[in-house]
Structure formats: structure tokens, C-alpha cells
Amino acid sequence: MPRRPKYERRTIPPDPKYGSELLQRFINKVMKRGKKSLAERIVYSALDIVAQRTGQHPLEVFQRAIHNASPLLEVKPRRVGGATYQVPVQVEPHRRVSLAMRWLIQSARNRSGYKFVDKLAAEIIDAANNTGATIKKRDDTHRMAEANRAFAHYRW
């Protein structure tokens, strides 16, 4: 029986421009040192660029990018008799979205270019089209889980 209490997830109010809770979570992930207005400006500018380049509604493109980048499986280390096995496990829905957002931001930061807004917009478009570094990261995670499928019976 767990000793710690089970905590409720905080409800995040939707963002003011699009009314999306998912987008508000993304803004919070982009934010550094509590500068939320800067993070909002960056994300909204990136979405404007996405709308300009694709000609589609930016929120739909963003949601498609998050959906495409979300991993279904990941590996977790499990120690059994002195050996550590990488055990494939299913990813919880909330963590799935969080990982997709984190990978999207990391990939945008690692991209070559000058402005983060442009890099983020390009990465969102790539992820929506099932290409780019974010999708590669998801595929690598799935590949690791598939390679360690033999240890799936060690799940807890």
C-alpha cells in the first residue's frame, strides 16, 4: 500500500486567445523564470507563422503535432536480481502529452536558426506532418520499447 497520498491534478485555466487548455500547458512549458507574458508572445507568434505557412487553423495544426509526437510506449529501468532491465511500459495519457510538448520544445531549441519563434513554428509544422526531430525522438523511444519487448513480463 502506498504511503504517500494521491494528489489531484491542478486544473489549468485555458489560454485567453484560443481557449485551449492544451495550449496553456504548452505556454507554461515554454516559460522560463516565470516570464509568462514572454512565453505567450513566443507561442502566439509561432502559431501565427504556422497559420501563415500552412493556411490551416493554427490550433488544429498544433493539436495534430502533439498527437503525432506523443509516445505510446517507453522503457523504464527495473532491477531484478542484480541486473537492470529496460522494461517497456505504456505511457499514461497526461505524461504522453507532457513528453510530446517537452520533445517539441527541445527539438525547436536544438534547431539551427536565429529566432526561437521561427524554429518553434517550423518544428510544430514538421511534427504535424510526421517529420522532424520530435518524431524521430518518438520513433527512437518506440524502437527501444520494441527492442526490449522480451522483458515486458517484468512489468509492475
Curated annotation (Swiss-Prot):
Q: Name one GO molecular function term.
A: rRNA binding
Which GO terms fall under biological process for this protein?
A: translation
Kindly list the GO CC terms recorded for this protein.
small ribosomal subunit
Which keywords does this Swiss-Prot/TrEMBL entry list? Ribonucleoprotein, Ribosomal protein, RNA-binding, rRNA-binding, tRNA-binding
SUPFAM superfamilies annotated for this entry?
Ribosomal protein S7 (SSF47973)
Write out the similarity annotation: Belongs to the universal ribosomal protein uS7 family.
Q: How is this protein organized at the quaternary level?
A: Part of the 30S ribosomal subunit. Contacts proteins S9 and S11.
Q: What does this protein do?
A: One of the primary rRNA binding proteins, it binds directly to 16S rRNA where it nucleates assembly of the head domain of the 30S subunit. Is located at the subunit interface close to the decoding center, probably blocks exit of the E-site tRNA.
Name of protein: Small ribosomal subunit protein uS7
Q: Which organism is it from?
A: Thermomicrobium roseum (strain ATCC 27502 / DSM 5159 / P-2)
